[in-house]
Regions:
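Short S/T/G/P-rich N-terminal loop/turn motif that feeds into the first structured element of a domain
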Residues: 1-56, 63-73, 89, 96-107
Length: 107
């Protein structure tokens, strides 16, 4: 069953333009480097007015919980986590199944 994985990222200070570009480049490499997800999106909030300090969002979908677990353990993802930890990032993650209970409007 498809799993949606959403993560919000908060940092104690604003990332530099170079750091923000590095973060985006790392995530952009995942479809080729990791290859387990069926969707991968990453962006920043448009206004910052309602983010409560979480200006970055990662949206991914995986074909199964097993694929999500493989992604979490993948060395490329582990390198990303180390990059986040080096910047004292506070992530907020949420995973759930995409099924008849959660899909309220089909694509």
């Amino acid at each position: 069953m498809t799993v949606q994985h959403i993560v919000l990222f908060s940092f104690p200070r604003e990332l530099s333009a170079a750091e923000a570009a590095d973060m985006r480049a790392m995530v952009a490499s995942w479809p080729k480097e990791i290859g387990l997800m069926t969707k991968c999106r990453f962006g920043t909030d448009l206004t910052g007015a309602r983010t409560r300090g979480y200006p970055y969002l990662l949206y991914t979908e995986f074909p199964s919980e097993e694929a999500l677990a493989e992604y979490r353990a993948h060395p490329v993802h582990q390198d990303f986590l180390a990059w986040l930890n080096a910047r004292d990032c506070t992530p907020l993650a949420f995973d759930y199944h995409l099924d008849g209970q959660t899909v309220l409007m089909a694509e």
